[in-house]
């Protein structure tokens, strides 16, 4: 079944006739493939590996190089990510470039008029399925350089490390309180293979590597900007580690002595438990004998029962009024 956004686009198929089309943003279905016979060519650019791995010929990357007669951009709740991607697309487009922007109202798509007004003409052309569809024509090209989008931060909890992050990465500008609590449970005695799952900008894995130099660090995430950020955080701090894309355990090989995570429980603007449920239910198959799963979570989330079902006893290593750090052994 196609998304609400794609259902609105289906009402405007004449836009696609005979054109080369680039789909980008938060696309989550196979709508582009259904237009193969209508368009002269189709490209898809996504920064989400959980989508890219399920579709054919998706460009999974931070930066995209290419042009098309028509760009279709699926708006997301992550405004920093939206701005980062749209500026990229506009910077390499030609004057007169045609763009359709589609998004759910609850995700803030209405702000597209203010976002794109400095660069051309924009008008709302449809409203249905609780979505808005906008047509944009480029008149003033912006300038894009990746180096201008990097943010950095430091924090007493992370010693002398500097964390690097791109737009859209979780807790991009400062250390979040959940991760800070999780880091308070880390000592300098961690050994063996460590998996920082859902690594974001790489703060957890980097802190472990800095304090336990013999630990072998692997970092994974589904977000292209997070992976690029984790790479840079490691390299700029002269730390060694492996970083690659995986949707929870989809591309994980081997077993680990410690799997550690501040797992996401938001999917766009909804609370979604799929990722953390897979993390807890499948972790034992990726842990060495005696290995540990350690996660931080909002105290109200129903993870204790899942942990009990799949591991038996669990331990709370640290807690505040809002967060708890859980530990289970294989």
From Swiss-Prot:
Coiled-coil segments: none
Alphabetized InterPro entries for the sequence: DNA_methylase_N6_adenine_CS (IPR002052), Mtase_sm_N (IPR013675), rRNA_ssu_MeTfrase_C (IPR023543), RsmC/RlmG (IPR046977), SAM-dependent_MTases_sf (IPR029063), Small_mtfrase_dom (IPR007848)
Primary location recorded for the protein, binned into one broad class: cytoplasm
Catalytic activity: guanosine(1207) in 16S rRNA + S-adenosyl-L-methionine = N(2)-methylguanosine(1207) in 16S rRNA + S-adenosyl-L-homocysteine + H(+)
Record localization: Cytoplasm
EC number per UniProt: 2.1.1.172
Enzyme class: transferase
An MF annotation (GO) of this entry: nucleic acid binding
Keywords: Cytoplasm, Methyltransferase, rRNA processing, S-adenosyl-L-methionine, Transferase
Domain of life: Bacteria
Residues that span the membrane, as ranges: none
GO cellular component: cytoplasm
Described purpose of this protein according to its UniProt entry: Specifically methylates the guanine in position 1207 of 16S rRNA in the 30S particle.
Subunit structure: Monomer.
Homology family: Belongs to the methyltransferase superfamily. RsmC family.
Protein's recorded name: Ribosomal RNA small subunit methyltransferase C
Natural source organism: Haemophilus influenzae (strain 86-028NP)
């Amino acid at each position: 079944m196609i998304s609400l956004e794609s259902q609105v686009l289906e009402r405007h198929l004449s836009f696609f006739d005979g054109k080369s089309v680039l789909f980008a943003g938060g696309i989550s279905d196979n709508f582009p493939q259904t237009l193969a016979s209508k368009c002269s060519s189709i490209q898809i650019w996504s920064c989400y590996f959980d989508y890219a791995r399920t579709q054919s010929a998706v460009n999974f990357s931070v930066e995209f190089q290419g042009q098309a007669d028509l760009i279709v951009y699926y708006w997301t709740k992550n405004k920093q990510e939206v701005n980062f991607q749209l500026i990229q697309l506009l910077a390499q487009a030609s004057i007169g470039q045609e763009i359709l922007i589609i998004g759910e109202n609850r995700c803030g798509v209405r702000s597209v008029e203010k976002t794109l007004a400095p660069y051309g003409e924009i008008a709302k052309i449809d409203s249905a399925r609780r979505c808005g569809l906008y047509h944009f024509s480029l008149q003033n090209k912006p300038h894009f350089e990746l180096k201008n989008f990097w943010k950095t931060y430091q924090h007493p909890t992370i010693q002398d490390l500097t964390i690097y992050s791109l737009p859209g990465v979780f807790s991009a500008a400062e250390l979040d309180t959940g991760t800070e609590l999780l880091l308070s449970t880390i000592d300098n005695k961690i050994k063996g293979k460590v998996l920082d799952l859902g690594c974001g900008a790489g703060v957890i894995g980097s802190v472990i590597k800095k304090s336990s130099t013999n630990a072998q660090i692997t970092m994974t995430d589904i977000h292209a900007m997070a992976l690029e950020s984790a790479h840079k955080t490691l390299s700029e701090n002269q730390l060694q580690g492996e970083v690659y894309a995986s949707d929870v355990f989809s591309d994980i090989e081997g077993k680990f002595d410690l799997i550690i995570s501040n797992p996401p429980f938001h999917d766009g603007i909804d609370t979604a438990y799929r990722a953390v449920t897979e993390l807890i239910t499948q972790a034992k198959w990726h842990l060495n004998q005696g290995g540990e799963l350690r996660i931080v979570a909002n105290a109200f989330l129903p993870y204790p029962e899942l942990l009990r079902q799949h591991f038996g006893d669990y331990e709370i290593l640290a807690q505040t009024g809002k967060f708890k750090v859980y530990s289970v052994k294989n």
